[in-house]
Amino acid sequence: MRAAASAALALFLASCAGAPRAATASAAPPFIAEHFFAGRLDGVGTLKIVLHTPASTHVTSVGHAGADGVLALDQHIEQQGKPARDRQWRIRPLGNGRYTGTLTDASGPVTGETQGNRLHLHFPMKGGMRVDQWLTLSADGQVAQNHLIVRKLGVTVATLEETIRKIS
């Protein structure tokens, strides 16, 4: 179990945690990943891994959509007690609020779907772990609350909660 927790910590870090929260019935705009993640972003969060002390995280991101419509998101991740690292997302919109893509931390495809101001992403990781990530967009479209859960054999081994802000 300790190895799975350590792997979760090292493999992902840059998103968030917790159980999914219901979207509020506010005037928040729909979550369109290729719009929100375009430009520079800054994320601050707390990573909780079973049998470990919670660790702070800081993620800087730069995203842009290519002519082919694929969102390229490059991230620099700093986690308390670990060396900094980089990772890349490539997300392709499929239409009707659905997405597919890749992540350097994932061991298989990333899939996603939106419902109103929420984006749900899910993907497998090494060691038989599964990730579910929910991002909820604020009413002004400038901030997303990121809640991420990592499970192994159906048991939660790590969670991350992060606030992501657009800075350009």
Description of each model-found segment:
Residues F37-G45, N146:
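A short, Trp-centered hydrophobic/proline-enriched beta-strand micro-motif
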Residues V44-K126, V131-W134:
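Central antiparallel beta-sheet cores of small beta-barrel/beta-sandwich binding domains
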Residues M1-S6:
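Bacterial N-terminal signal peptides that target proteins for export
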Residues L135-V143, H147-S168:
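Edge beta-strand at a domain terminus
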